[in-house]
Amino acid sequence: MSQISAADVKNLRDITGAGMMDCKKALDETGGDMQQAIDFLRKKGAALAAKRADREAHEGMIQVKLANDCKRGVLLELNCETDFVARGNDFTSFTAALSELALSQCVASAEAMLPLALGAAYDGETVDSAMKTMTGKLGEKINLKRLAFFDMPDGVVEGYIHPGAKLGAIVSLKTDKPELVGELAKDLAMQIAAAAPIVVDRSGVPADYIAKEAEIYRQQALEQGKKEEFVDKIVTGRLEKYYQDVVLTEQVFIKDDKLKVSAMLDQFRKKNQATLDVVGFVRYQLGE
């Protein structure tokens, strides 16, 4: 067996990021062959990933990546097991690499990412293989939980990540004056992250769900001894409150509590003689 030098161990560690003892063992097991040692560590990572497949991975980070022209964007959640790993350079760099790949390839789901090849920084491994390698390197389960992709050639896509990278949102807007919408789009992304709407407008709330909620409110009012003639008004009031909570355009605008989001959008349309519609949005909170 060839003698393993400290320089060889350091070189392998620089290439793979694995621990010194793991690198020494890999070189010992492969007779000092650097490429075989790299493969050995990757296989070890895959084996560890299999062992940790059932582990809970609720820490991690939310990442948003936008095209330079803000016509496309990606929001994703990458999970690990501890906040310590989530804040490390290896994990944050890997998250950034995934978001860049997803954006460049216009990937619409986490599952569609798995067979795609990463760049030279990850030796061209597929995303699936690279996650296993990262699991071996960091000693924790690494999992791409979810991903959302927006493409809006007739408008803009904008995103927001709350400090700490545990909460984020992405929104797409259709407009005939995209050059004017940048700040408004950023405000909307922040609104979505902070206020957690579910739909853009009332039409997005299923009618059967509203009917069910109305019946629940009606029964609650009757059980509280409210008079029959007042029940309908009570139900209507509670439904209005529900809409204000879950419908984006009905929410109070976070930058001006005297305005609803719908009024803020109307002001922009009138001031700029522009068309403007919120097409869709996605909000991720870590560990949901």
From Swiss-Prot:
<dbReference type="InterPro" id="IPR018101">
    <property type="entry name" value="Transl_elong_Ts_CS"/>
</dbReference>
<dbReference type="InterPro" id="IPR001816">
    <property type="entry name" value="Transl_elong_EFTs/EF1B"/>
</dbReference>
<dbReference type="GO" id="GO:0005737">
    <property type="term" value="C:cytoplasm"/>
</dbReference>
<dbReference type="InterPro" id="IPR009060">
    <property type="entry name" value="UBA-like_sf"/>
</dbReference>
<keyword id="KW-0648">Protein biosynthesis</keyword>
<comment type="similarity">
    <text>Belongs to the EF-Ts family.</text>
</comment>
<protein>
    <recommendedName>
        <fullName>Elongation factor Ts</fullName>
    </recommendedName>
</protein>
<feature type="region of interest" description="Involved in Mg(2+) ion dislocation from EF-Tu">
    <location>
        <begin position="82"/>
        <end position="85"/>
    </location>
</feature>
<keyword id="KW-0251">Elongation factor</keyword>
<dbReference type="InterPro" id="IPR036402">
    <property type="entry name" value="EF-Ts_dimer_sf"/>
</dbReference>
<dbReference type="Pfam" id="PF00889">
    <property type="entry name" value="EF_TS"/>
</dbReference>
<comment type="function">
    <text>Associates with the EF-Tu.GDP complex and induces the exchange of GDP to GTP. It remains bound to the aminoacyl-tRNA.EF-Tu.GTP complex up to the GTP hydrolysis stage on the ribosome.</text>
</comment>
<keyword id="KW-0963">Cytoplasm</keyword>
<dbReference type="InterPro" id="IPR014039">
    <property type="entry name" value="Transl_elong_EFTs/EF1B_dimer"/>
</dbReference>
<dbReference type="GO" id="GO:0003746">
    <property type="term" value="F:translation elongation factor activity"/>
</dbReference>
